[in-house]
Design a protein with these regions (language model features):
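Conserved beta-strand hairpin/beta-sheet module of binuclear metal-dependent hydrolase folds
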Residues: 2-52, 156-168
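Short acidic-hydrophobic surface loop/beta-edge motif
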Residues: 5, 23, 130-137
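Active-site HxH/HxHxD metal-binding segment of metal-dependent hydrolases
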Residues: 39-135
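Divalent metal-coordination and catalytic microenvironments
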Residues: 10, 23, 34, 49, ...
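Hydrophobic/aromatic beta-strand patches that form the interior of the parallel beta-sheet core
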Residues: 12, 31, 60, 85, ...
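C-terminal regulatory/interaction regions
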Residues: 237-301
Length: 301
């Protein structure tokens, strides 16, 4: 049985904890949209291409998070002439993945616990920077959908009736498991949800979750929006008393009943809380003040 799960004539995917998109080109090639966490997710891509007798022409990395680019190095090293495409603001972090644990370590050299494959993939050169709203690869035109928010310059890809939405939205089962969707920019994340809700493709594939037909998209978007708003309310409620970022994060964790077992998960959670604090400050709902106890957050108007 083929590893490819067909979606439409020219699209397919390899399902898993990370869904990997495949675009089939008319010249007998293929384009991979994200490659998963590591070589163990890169290998099925290679095997599926071999089974289908197709050559990998390119990888489009939707954003720099390790669970989306970790298979890049394996595929680039083992296959010939594979070009990597990424958005301008994502490319430096794809080429230099140490930057991800650095920013999760407040800009410091990251501790060893944050230098694992969960946060730091192996880097590869990005040959093509995506700046516009469409690109052509191997004779196939792909629409680029701006989906910032989860990361600084995340993109989706639309082709042949399918929108590969990366982490622009999550499947409902993923939301219920993790509680607070990770965000770099909460306002941009909400705007990207609205942008997805307006699209008319027949199918939408999230990076994590089930393939979603157009008829079920509104419900999925609503669940994502509610999860973001729930997190925002929890952060705002945590400001009934002043506190630094870590104190606020502890309050939010308790309020949401989240169990955090590892340092990578904790670093990601604290960064998400910090994104919500920044959003509240920018909208006048929180204040950041320097005190004798350090940088302290307080509720705003």
């Amino acid at each position: 049985m083929s590893l490819f799960q067909p979606i439409t004539t020219h699209t397919a995917y390899i399902p898993g904890a990370n869904n990997l998109g495949i675009v089939l080109t008319d010249d007998g090639g293929a384009i991979a949209i994200d490659t998963g966490l590591d070589r163990d997710t890169g290998r099925p891509v290679r095997r599926a291409l071999d089974e289908a007798q197709r050559q990998l022409r390119a990888i489009i990395s939707t954003h720099h998070h390790a669970d989306h680019i970790g298979g890049n190095e394996y595929l680039v090293r083992n296959l010939s002439n594979v070009a990597v495409y990424a958005a301008r603001l994502e490319a430096p972090l794809i080429e230099h993945p140490l930057l991800e644990p650095i920013y999760l370590s407040l800009g410091a050299t990251p501790p060893s616990a944050l230098r694992t494959k969960w946060l730091m993939a192996k880097g590869v050169p990005v040959q093509h920077i995506i700046d516009g709203d469409a690109i052509e690869i191997a004779g196939t035109t792909l629409e680029i959908v701006a989906l910032p928010g989860h990361s600084i310059g995340q993109i989706g890809v639309a082709v042949d009736g399918v929108c590969f939405a990366a982490d622009g939205f999550f499947g409902p089962e993923v939301i219920s498991k993790h509680g607070i969707p990770y965000a770099h920019d909460v306002a941009a994340q909400l705007a990207s949800l609205e942008r997805l809700a307006m699209r008319k493709e027949r199918f939408f594939l999230p990076g994590h979750g089930e393939l979603t037909p157009q008829s079920e998209l509104d419900a999925a978007i609503r669940i994502n929006r509610l999860a973001i708003e729930r997190a925002m309310h929890a952060v705002r409620d945590a400001l009934t008393e002043p506190g630094d970022t870590l104190t606020v994060a502890r309050r939010v964790q308790r309020a949401l009943g989240l169990t955090i077992t590892g340092l990578p998960q904790y670093a990601i959670f604290v960064a998400a809380v910090a994104a919500h604090l920044s959003h509240l400050e920018l909208t006048g709902a929180a204040m950041l003040m320097m005190t004798d106890e350090g940088a302290i957050w307080r509720g705003g108007s």
